[in-house]
């Protein structure tokens, strides 16, 4: 093979391999001119893509890393629209391209939160991003080779647009990667010089990247002319000589492989590659279902791993759908069962209404009833009759709840629809009563910090300003000058509580509703707060302390004091996922409620959680409406 010839010509050491892979002097000059042309082709583009980021990396961290290179116009960490979790990549925009070039040279593959980042020019044209020209595929890579090592190896052949090692869910290398060159000539040069060479003592394959659609089309053609045969149930006593004798009688072979374990013992299966397709078909027909040393053999076309997994997945889905269709309308769900009810008693209670095929009470690991179970009838008519007769009937002193059983995904979908309808109705009522902002202005996802005294434009804005997932600076400020913190009407630049506040503090709210101050709680004749309503089960400690503080504070500080107590509770909610920016926005929305209502729920965990969920739903609906527009 050509790979072996190239491998023999290549030295074994890593240093020598790298030297062997480097282009000639004339090629180096060509590469230099390509780099120059690349920079010219970038035009005025000063936007960088930053990938391989830890989910906890924020705009603030990236700003502090990139701003020393040159004035940064904006930083945006891309997040999921619903969960607000980082997608692992971001965009950094500089004022001029020279700063972007320097950042690419100095910061590419530098560690951010102990993970090397991957930086390349942001390519807004999807046609250029998806083009296959200049894209090469490298496999059989040593696990120790990372993105930087791959980039260093292949950068000698031309300007690289992107370079990536494929990894699993744990971040470990999968042994292959991709390098996208600016020109097809650079890609061809890399293939000629590196294909079949040793990298970290492993011979690598380098070839043009073939899109998956083209690979699948080619694969379908290969399936109709296969020559590789898989044979199993050979037993563990078979020898290589016996296996070769078994398969060679059908025709000439290219290779024969009997699988063995670490100890060299056969594992019971093997592969045979025949030279002709017709011979492979003949071997399958001749070996399938035949006896060999007491075992019935199986022979068939050798399949790729992903192909076998896909077939198993399809078989599982078909079996699952068959079961679901079989039990549709005949399986009942029963809950509120007494602990004394077991399978036999459950069957006896429901037996008068039809023929029962199965009855099961669900139990925990200790064998104790979970209080619910299932009964399956032979026909939908019997199941419907049982629901009519047994629903709300007293059994062992407890009324039963009996309905047709539903799949978990159907049940979840119906529940989400019910919650959404309920939240929409509640939000409409609150908007009509002024409980929550009825109108959102400005562009969500962009936050403009400005000079001291800056106010976000628009009325009806959210108390924390628009979604501060994108940080922007005023046009061309002095280099290394950060925007001020604690901007009225919004969070500080990074979406966290402003400096000067205690841990868990909350920033003061700026003017809203067209410049009018936010509504307060229950002011007295001189604007003093009358205090929170008393609860029947005793005053809550948090609400009581807030009430005392409000009585001694000016009216304009009421929202601030309540926010300082409310913000840490919102931040601790599971749905917020520790996102300080998101917690700030939701807290600001809750502060649009009357203070009296806030104090009523601030110590009620379920009540506060319901209000938070309503606010999250309202915010997500707003984002979706903006996308539709």
From Swiss-Prot:
Domain PABC: 542-624
InterPro entries: Nucleotide-bd_a/b_plait_sf, PABP-dom, PABP_1234, PABP_HYD_C, PABP_RRM1, RBD_domain_sf, RRM2_I_PABPs, RRM_dom
Cellular component aspect of the GO annotation: cytoplasmic stress granule; cytosol; nucleus; post-mRNA release spliceosomal complex; ribonucleoprotein complex
An annotated GO BP: nuclear-transcribed mRNA poly(A) tail shortening
Basic and acidic residues composition-biased segments: 26-42
Domain of life: Eukaryota
Region (Disordered): 1-47, 465-543
Protein name: Polyadenylate-binding protein, cytoplasmic and nuclear
Gene field: PAB1
């Amino acid at each position: 093979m050509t790979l072996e010839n190239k491998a023999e010509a290549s030295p074994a050491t890593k240093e020598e391999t790298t030297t062997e892979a480097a282009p000639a002097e004339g090629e180096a000059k060509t590469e230099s001119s390509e780099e120059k042309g690349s920079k010219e082709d970038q035009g005025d583009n000063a936007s960088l893509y930053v990938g391989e980021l830890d989910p906890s990396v924020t705009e603030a961290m990236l700003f502090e890393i990139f701003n020393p290179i040159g004035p940064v116009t904006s930083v945006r960490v891309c997040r999921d629209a619903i969960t607000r979790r980082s997608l692992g990549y971001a965009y950094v925009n500089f004022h001029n391209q020279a700063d972007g070039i320097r950042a690419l040279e100095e910061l590419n593959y530098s560690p951010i939160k102990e993970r090397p980042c991957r930086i390349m020019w942001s390519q807004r044209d999807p046609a250029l991003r998806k083009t296959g020209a200049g894209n090469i595929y490298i496999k059989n890579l040593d696990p120790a080779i990372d993105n930087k090592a791959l980039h260093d190896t292949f950068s000698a052949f031309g300007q690289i647009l992107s370079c990536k090692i494929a990894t699993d869910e744990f971040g470990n290398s999968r042994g292959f990667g991709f390098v996208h060159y600016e020109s097809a000539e650079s890609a061809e040069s890399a293939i000629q010089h590196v294909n079949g060479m040793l990298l970290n003592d492993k011979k690598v394959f380098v070839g043009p990247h073939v899109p998956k659609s083209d690979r699948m089309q080619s694969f379908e053609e290969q399936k109709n002319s296969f020559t590789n045969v898989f044979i199993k149930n050979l037993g563990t006593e078979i020898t290589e000589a016996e296996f070769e004798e078994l398969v060679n009688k059908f025709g000439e072979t290219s290779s024969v492989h009997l699988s063995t374990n670490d100890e060299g013992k056969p594992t019971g299966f093997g592969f045979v590659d025949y030279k002709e397709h017709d011979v492979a078909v003949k071997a399958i027909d001749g070996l399938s279902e035949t006896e060999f040393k007491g075992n019935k053999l199986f022979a068939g076309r050798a399949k790729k791993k992903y192909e076998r997994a896909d077939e198993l997945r399809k078989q599982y889905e078909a079996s699952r759908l068959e079961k679901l269709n079989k039990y549709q309308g005949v399986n009942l769900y029963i809950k509120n069962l007494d602990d004394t009810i077991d399978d036999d008693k459950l069957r006896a209670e429901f037996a008068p209404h039809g023929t029962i095929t199965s009855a099961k009470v669900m139990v925990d690991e200790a064998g104790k009833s979970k209080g619910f179970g299932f009964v399956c009838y032979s026909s939908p008519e019997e199941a419907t009759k049982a629901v009519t007769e047994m629903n709300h009937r007293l059994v062992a002193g407890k009324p039963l709840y009996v309905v047709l059983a539903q799949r978990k995904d159907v049940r979840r979908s119906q529940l989400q629809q019910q919650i959404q309808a309920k939240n929409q109705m509640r939000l409409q009522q609150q908007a009509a009563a002024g409980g929550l902002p009825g109108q959102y202005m400005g562009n969500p996802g962009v936050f403009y910090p400005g000079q001291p005294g800056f106010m976000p434009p628009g009325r009806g804005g959210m108390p924390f300003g628009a979604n501060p997932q994108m940080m922007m600076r005023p046009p061309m400020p002095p280099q290394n000058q950060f925007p001020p913190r604690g901007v009225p009407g919004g969070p500080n630049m990074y979406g966290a509580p402003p400096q000067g506040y205690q841990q868990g503090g909350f920033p003061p709210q700026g003017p809203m509703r067209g410049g009018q101050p936010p509504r307060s709680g229950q002011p007295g004749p001189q604007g003093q707060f009358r205090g929170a309503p008393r609860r029947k089960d005793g005053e809550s400690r948090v609400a009581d302390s807030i009430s005392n503080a409000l009585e001694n504070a000016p009216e304009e500080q009421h929202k601030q004091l309540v926010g300082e107590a409310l913000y840490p509770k919102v931040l601790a909610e599971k749905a917020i996922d520790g996102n300080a920016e998101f917690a700030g926005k939701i807290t600001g929305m809750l502060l649009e409620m009357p203070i009296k209502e806030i104090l009523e729920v601030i110590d009620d965990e379920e009540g506060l959680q319901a209000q938070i969920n309503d606010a999250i739903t309202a915010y997500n609906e707003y984002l979706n409406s903006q996308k539709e527009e």
